[in-house]
């Protein structure tokens, strides 16, 4: 059994991870931690997340001795802020732990990226170079080999799973940039209370126009420019992305369908719906990404639906763990 620890366990993604670890036949939950100054420190996780009552009755402890935690852990999940993961990941890695980081701290190679888009100077370029990008369906070999897996972001997962099959098959005319409009539930902003996310104030609206951090992540890993506009939805969880692309001259509907089928053959977390339009309610509380599409002339619209807390975060992290250790990919996810 792999002794597994979750740092940042009080948040939504941390709670989802705790439940998966508890269900996993090859893992044992070694500890749940939050920052030393967190108001949640010392509380039982079932007190913070009622759905865990009677399932996990373990306190969320303040992280005061990271080295001690490392010595008692085989696997570390970091469900922490970018700067926190940046500081903690190297410590756990140096102690021999396998690390799955759900923040953006190690997703893109290149120190300048973090100064420009995250507002801090990256101090661990050696781990940036070694990190595997955790887009599970597209990076299995690197995930198997790497001690550090930087789990892909929620919007970037929804977008890339929809676009990559067509790019790899050279069916897209990238002179016309793919346009991604994606809407996320408010859980994507975390548990911390704010006016924007309060019940009476939350409203469907775009945000982060031209400057959302996931835009350069998408561009970097796709290898082509995109226009990305995220939206805040007035619902709890899920992401629906609608992506418009121009196809190369002469591309047929059959070629499009073949590209998706070939890309996701034996990839059980991606469900191809063809011309059936995906819905958030069909993927909510599941580890799946549903993809549907329509072709008209030289244009294609692809719709991608995921649960932002699961395929966009926790279940993808666990999927990466399953890949890394050679377990069945959906172990503990269903």
UniProtKB/Swiss-Prot annotation:
InterPro entries, per the entry: AGPR_AS, AGPR_type-1, NAD(P)-bd_dom_sf, NAGSA_dehydrogenase, Semialdehyde_DH_NAD-bd
Catalytic activity: N-acetyl-L-glutamate 5-semialdehyde + phosphate + NADP(+) = N-acetyl-L-glutamyl 5-phosphate + NADPH + H(+)
One protein family per Pfam: Semialdhyde_dh
Active site (UniProt): 154
GO biological process: L-arginine biosynthetic process
Primary location group: cytoplasm
Keyword terms of this UniProt record: Amino-acid biosynthesis, Arginine biosynthesis, Cytoplasm, NADP, Oxidoreductase
Pathway recorded for this protein: Amino-acid biosynthesis; L-arginine biosynthesis; N(2)-acetyl-L-ornithine from L-glutamate: step 3/4
CDD domains listed in its UniProt record: AGPR_1_C (cd23934), AGPR_1_N (cd17895)
Highest rank taxon of the organism: Bacteria
Record has rRNA processing as a keyword: no
Location within or outside the cell: Cytoplasm
Entries under SMART domains matching the protein: Semialdhyde_dh (SM00859)
Enzyme nomenclature, EC number: 1.2.1.38
One Gene Ontology cellular component: cytoplasm
Molecular function as annotated in GO: N-acetyl-gamma-glutamyl-phosphate reductase activity; NAD binding; NADP+ binding
Family: Belongs to the NAGSA dehydrogenase family. Type 1 subfamily.
Job description of the protein: Catalyzes the NADPH-dependent reduction of N-acetyl-5-glutamyl phosphate to yield N-acetyl-L-glutamate 5-semialdehyde.
Protein name (database record): N-acetyl-gamma-glutamyl-phosphate reductase
Source organism: Vibrio vulnificus (strain YJ016)
